[in-house]
Amino acid sequence: MKIDILTLFPEMFAPLEHSIVGKAREKGLLEINYHNFRENAEKSRHVDDEPYGGGQGMLLRAQPIFDAYDDIEKKQPRVILLDPAGRTFDQAYAEELAKEEELIFICGHYEGYDERIKTLVTDEISLGDYILTGGELAAMTMIDATVRLIPEVIGKEASHTDDSFSSGLLEYPQYTRPYDYRGMVVPEVLMSGHHENIRKWRLYESLKKTYLRRPDLLKHYEMTVEEEAMLEEIRHAHSD
């Protein structure tokens, strides 16, 4: 995968040199290029200006971003604009992006964008209903969530397919050594070695956590007969 990032602050992306994303780059599975579009600004070096019609704040000008975009070697990239008004980013969208060969992220850092910039864009994306100073943190979040889904980036596919949201449910509780820590012991079923009982326990706990913390996820989750029976039991146990 090739990722190009248009930003005024390329130094903010230093964390992408490490952990899973850094390893993906070392393996040759990922290429990331940074483009400081201030370098594409005209002689004034100004990348922003006051909006026509008045109003508070500044807008990013179209010219520096268009020129930076034109300088990128590309075929048919997915072009993502980080914008609070965009579609909310989620796991399903990360899985969608992980199938792409080229991604371009446009990160703003002022009041907004000249509307004409959006003619370059295929996707307008937001992390949620809140405002960040710029798009850099949002872009890093999306890149991390996406890159870890690329085949061969993580050793075992189960490492991410069992994650919360990948299955449609929140992840079940997990434990490691020691068995007893400050009086808190590991559930006996996990010590039993009985794989079917462990599977059922994990599924039950996953359903319970989702029901109690994120019931909205269950609206779109297609349940098996076994899961429906478990959920009914969970509802009854927590009906008070």
Curated annotation (Swiss-Prot):
It is an enzyme of class 2 (transferase). One of its GO terms (biological process) is tRNA N1-guanine methylation. GO terms for molecular function: tRNA (guanine(37)-N1)-methyltransferase activity. It catalyses: guanosine(37) in tRNA + S-adenosyl-L-methionine = N(1)-methylguanosine(37) in tRNA + S-adenosyl-L-homocysteine + H(+). It is found in: Cytoplasm. Keywords: Cytoplasm, Methyltransferase, S-adenosyl-L-methionine, Transferase, tRNA processing. The keyword Cell membrane does not apply. Gene3D superfamilies: 3.40.1280.10, tRNA(m1g37)methyltransferase, domain 2. Transmembrane segments: none annotated. Its EC number is 2.1.1.228. It holds the Pfam family tRNA_m1G_MT. One of its GO terms (cellular component) is cytosol. S-adenosyl-L-methionine binds at residues 108, 127-132. The keyword S-adenosyl-L-methionine applies. Homodimer. Belongs to the RNA methyltransferase TrmD family. Specifically methylates guanosine-37 in various tRNAs. This is tRNA (guanine-N(1)-)-methyltransferase. It comes from Streptococcus sanguinis (strain SK36). The gene is trmD.
